[in-house]
UniProtKB/Swiss-Prot annotation:
Pfam families: DUF5541
Native source organism of the sequence: Homo sapiens (Human)
Protein name, as recorded: Uncharacterized protein C12orf76
């Protein structure tokens, strides 16, 4: 299942750049199905990618909520908190905070920048985290 979002981004120089963000639904990784990842395909330009993270995070959560997904925003996080965290996006890549069990993924707080422009979202236990996927 894919969900495409389109819009524009205005750089500091005043140039308006169109973009498309595609969300791909992944399989649940928890037995109760609570944690589900959405792979977000951001623009290839790494300079733009970090500035789209806040849009990606908020849009993904909002879309899941209106579609009635099992693990959606109302159950896991306050919208205001997500918005506050996402406002810190665009400040440059942040080093991985903690490797996951398989050693190939790194979890970041919601809104952190992804250096490669690929972001996976997970919602679980009253938190939303951005997961960095190394390729």
């Amino acid at each position: 299942m894919f969900q495409n979002l389109q819009g524009t981004f205005e750089k500091e120089i005043g140039k308006i750049i169109p973009f498309t963000i595609a969300f791909k639904r992944a399989e649940a990784v928890e037995p109760d199905g609570c944690v589900q990842s959405w792979r977000c395909c951001l623009p290839c330009d790494l300079g733009q990618a970090s500035r789209f993270i806040h849009t990606t995070v908020c849009s993904a959560i909002r879309w899941r909520s209106c579609k009635g997904e099992r693990n959606f925003a109302e159950r896991h996080i306050l919208p205001a908190e997500l918005e506050e965290q996402s406002n810190h996006a665009g400040m440059g890549p942040i080093l991985p905070a903690m490797p996951s069990v398989d050693g190939n993924h790194f979890q970041h707080p919601a809104g952190d920048c992804h250096p490669y422009g690929i972001l996976c979202l997970q919602a679980h236990s009253a938190s939303v985290t951005a997961r960095q996927v190394l390729q």
